[in-house]
């Protein structure tokens, strides 16, 4: 069993009164806000409970540990980002537009403007609480990279990009562009996908 599998992303369910889903949502939102402001090590479950209008015992009945709660908050964000994608499938787009859209979905801040701060915090916690980075890799980073790689593989198979295109390296470069932009304090991260495509596409496109 992996560390991620041991981290519970779903609230505990037990006998008694029906669950208050509005309270669950309030707790998740309070957790996400404090993660961005304070980081994993510094967040207080008492403060989260107070911000959500509940108590620590009520919080613990839902998520037995801080890690369980934070994983649940991350899972909520991953689902929300996926739900926010355009309804048109990438496979229905023209080759260049499909490449751009897949790059766009790599953006950690696609849905959550504070995502880069969270990523930095989780990387800083890699030795103390490696489960956090495991969750991010398995539920967010790897699936999004796999989607871009699948787009590139299809384009390569169809002869739209060069047969010697290193799909994995291209995907890694695209993902890394978001971190470099954040660290350089470039203002418009929303334009990254187009700029990266403008740079890489001419060297990838198949002759003829």
From Swiss-Prot:
* GO terms for MF: DNA-binding transcription factor activity; transcription cis-regulatory region binding
PROSITE patterns in UniProt: HTH_TETR_2 (PS50977)
Entry keywords, A to Z? Cytoplasm, DNA-binding, Repressor, Transcription, Transcription regulation
Q: Name one GO cellular component term.
A: cytoplasm
- Disordered: region residues: 1-22
The record's annotation in InterPro entries points to: Homeodomain-like_sf, HTH-type_TetR-like_transc_reg, HTH_TetR, Tet_transcr_reg_TetR-rel_C_sf, TetR_C
The main place the protein resides is cytoplasm
Which locations, inside or outside the cell, does it occupy?
Answer: Cytoplasm
Q: Is Signal set as a keyword in this record?
A: no
Relate the induction remark in this record.
Negatively autoregulated. Transcription is induced by 4-nitrobenzoate.
Q: Where is the signal peptide?
A: none
Residue intervals annotated as DNA-binding region are: 44-63
Query: Where does the HTH tetR-type domain start and stop, copy by copy?
Result: 21-81
Q: Note how its activity is modulated.
A: 4-nitrobenzoate prevents the binding of PnbX to the pnb locus, leading to its expression. Other potential ligand molecules, including 3-nitrobenzoate, 2-nitrobenzoate, benzoate, protocatechuate, chloramphenicol and 4-hydroxylaminobenzoate, have no preventive effects on PnbX binding to the DNA.
Role noted for this protein:
Transcriptional repressor that negatively regulates expression of the pnbBA operon, involved in the degradation of 4-nitrobenzoate, and its own expression. In the absence of 4-nitrobenzoate, binds specifically to the promoter region of the pnb locus, inhibiting its expression.
Q: What is this protein called?
A: HTH-type transcriptional repressor PnbX
Instruction: Specify the species.
Output: Nocardioides sp. (strain LMS-CY)
Gene name of the record: pnbX
């Amino acid at each position: 069993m992996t560390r991620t599998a041991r981290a519970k992303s779903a609230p505990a369910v037990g006998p008694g009164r029906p669950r208050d889903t509005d309270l669950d949502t309030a707790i998740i939102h309070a957790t996400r806000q404090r993660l961005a402001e304070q980081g994993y090590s510094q967040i207080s479950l008492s403060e989260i409970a107070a911000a959500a209008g509940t108590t620590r015992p009520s919080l613990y009945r839902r998520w037995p540990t801080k890690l369980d709660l934070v994983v649940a908050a991350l899972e909520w964000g991953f689902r929300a980002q996926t739900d926010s994608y355009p309804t048109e499938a990438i496979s229905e787009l023209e080759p260049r537009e499909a490449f751009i859209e897949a790059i766009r979905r790599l953006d950690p801040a696609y849905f959550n403007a504070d995502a880069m701060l969270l990523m930095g915090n989780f990387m800083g916690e890699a030795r103390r609480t490696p489960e956090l980075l495991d969750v991010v890799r398995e539920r967010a980073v790897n699936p999004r990279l796999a989607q871009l790689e699948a787009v590139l593989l299809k384009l390569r198979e169809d002869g739209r990009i060069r047969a010697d295109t290193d799909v994995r390296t291209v995907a890694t470069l695209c993902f890394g562009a978001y971190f470099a932009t954040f660290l350089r304090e470039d203002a418009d991260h929303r334009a990254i996908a187009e700029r990266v495509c403008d740079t890489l596409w001419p060297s990838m496109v198949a002759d003829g």
